[in-house]
Structure formats: structure tokens, C-alpha cells
Amino acid sequence: MKQTKLNILIVLCLQMMTGLTLLSCSTENDEFKKELPPTEQPSEPTGALLERFSIDQLPAKTIYALGESIDLTGLKVTGEYDDGKQRSVNVAPKQISGFSSSVPADKQEVTITIEGKQKSFTIQVAPVRVENGVLTEVLKGYDEIILPNSVKSIPKNAFNGSKINKVTLNEGLKSIGDMAFFNSTIQEVIFPSTLEQLEENIFYYCYHLKKADLSRTKLTKLPASTFVYAGVEEVLLPATLKEIGAQAFLKTSQLKTIEIPENVKTIGLETFRESSVTTVKLPNGVTTMAQRAFYYCPELAEVTTYGSTFNDDPEAMIHPYCLEGCPKLARFEIPESIRILGQGLLGGNRKVTQLTIPANVTQINFSAFNNTGIKEVKVEGTTPPQVFEKVWYGFPD
């Protein structure tokens, strides 16, 4: 009897311990469940049927090079369902039909199909090939080309000799190589804001090019021979520009006016030699005007200055013969940062009758004003500049 009671007590104790253990586990599980994030609800409820959809935003890429695959990045589509709700819809390439980049196409209709409903948009396949961001081939026979945004650089001679009227350069393009449009029939080029570098001779012999608007680019240098013999009537330069290379505008017979951006410090050798430019605006901060920068510009009538002065360069100089052979020049302002006026600066000019020498000028070299028509000179500095023999040779008495 005693043994039976003992067994019953043992069983009861075991049951109590088991119950406590289960309760503890249950509590821990409840706490664990509280820590879990709530289960996400499906974006489309079961049973809701698509009635129609709209294309809210086209893909970022709508212009393709030959051989490129469809890219739906940026595409936004909204579906309307029979429960009265609108939801975003993800579109996969397998839901696209009509796309092919095997041949050029001005307008190619691409169709999205979702649950039997369809919407279309238009893409373009340019007559070019691109490999690793480099333009590798341009097909002939096209008057106008818009480059796809996969192009990062245009190599040397890419459009050399091409019979083409207009090229739209894509956003994302960084550089253009030597002689890229040399001797082509290009009439118009649209430049992107991302352009950072040009190499030499790009528009050499481009007689039909009338305007070059580089103002949105990030160029810091306009390289040598950029527009030699080009037909440009207007060139707009970017505020980021610091240097204009040698002969950049040599023999530009249609160019009439040019404003040099305020950050430009250097104007290279013979930059505007034998150009038909009539008016020029120079920044006061320019520190180097190389030899013959405006040599034999037969129509040049006015050179004026503007902007801030940067006078920290003791060698800032207008080099020899910079404005020689400009018979119509009647007004010439010397940039205020200049320290040295070179030999033959205005040699032979008879129309400039008044000249102001800025305060920063410390030296005027031999025959700087040889045989000119200057009648009045104003020196702004308290200390007259150093002069050499025959600086004023040819001045009227």
C-alpha cells in the first residue's frame, strides 16, 4: 500500500515538471514569434484580374547600338485590377516582343504583353557598334546619327571623311579622339554635358559645320587645331575652359565673334591666325597670349576685356606679334593681369589711337608699338613700366 502511494506521488511530480517545461517552451516560442517581422502581404491578392495597364515611365535606354540586348532599367508600369486597385507591375524581358538590334532602325515598336493585355513603345537602333564603351564602327549611308548612352569614348578617325549631316553625342560620353570628324560633311554636333576631353584636329576641314556649342561640356582645354579651316560662324565655349591650344581657330573664315571664358589663362600659338573674327572679349585673368595669337586677322576691329584680375604670375605676358597685321583694329584693351608686353605687339596698326597700360604691366619690350597710330597713352601704375630702346619707334611727335 505504501509502495502504491509512493508510485502515485512520483507520477504526479513528473506530470507537474512536464507541464512546467511545456509552459516554458510555449512562452519562449511566443516571445520568439514577437521578434519575427510581420509576414509581407502579396502585392497582388489571389483572384484579382488585370483589366488594363499603363506605361508610366519608359526605360532609361531607348537608343541601342547594333547587337545590344534589351534593357528595361527604369521602366515603370501600373496595372489596374478588377478589385478596383492599382499596383506596380514588374516586366521581364520574356514579356517583350518586337525587339531586334540586328539592323539599324529609326523607329522600332516594342510590345509589352501582360496577361493578354498589350502596350507598346518605340526604340531606336543606331547604325553603330559599341564594345566596352568604345565606338568601334559607324555604318555609312546615314545623314543623322544619335549615339546610344553606352558610348563612353569616340576613337581617332571615327567619322573621318563621312558624308553625314548631324550627330547627337550621348550623355555619358567622356572623350573624342584625334581627327574624329576630319574632312567630313558634318553640319551640326550636339555635345553632352559629360564631355571632358577632346584631342587635336577634331573638326579640321569641316567646311559645313556652322555652330559648335560646347558651353554645357566640362572641357578644360580646347586642343590644338580643333577648328582649322572649319566653317564655324559661332563657337560657344564652356566656363570650365582654362586653355585654348595652338591654331585652334586658324583660318576660320566665317567666325565673326568670340568670347573667351573667364577662367582661361592661356591662349596658344597662332590660335586665331588669319581668322575673320571681328570682335573678341578677353578675360582680365589671362596670363599668356602666345606669339601671333591674332596674327593677320584682317577683319578684327575690337578687342575688349572683362572679369576679375589675377595678378599672381610675374611672367604673365602678351608675346611678340600677337596683334600684328590687323589693319582694322581700332580698339584694344590690355588684360589687367598682364605684366609684360611683347615685341611688335601692335606693329603697323594705324587705327588704335588711344591705349591704356594697366597698373600690373612692368615691362614693355622692343618695338612693341612700332609704327602705330597711337596718339595718347595712359599708364595706370604709379611706377612706369621698364621700357627698351625704340619701344615707341614710329609714334607721331
Predicted features and spans:
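Bacterial N-terminal signal peptides
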Residues: 11-21
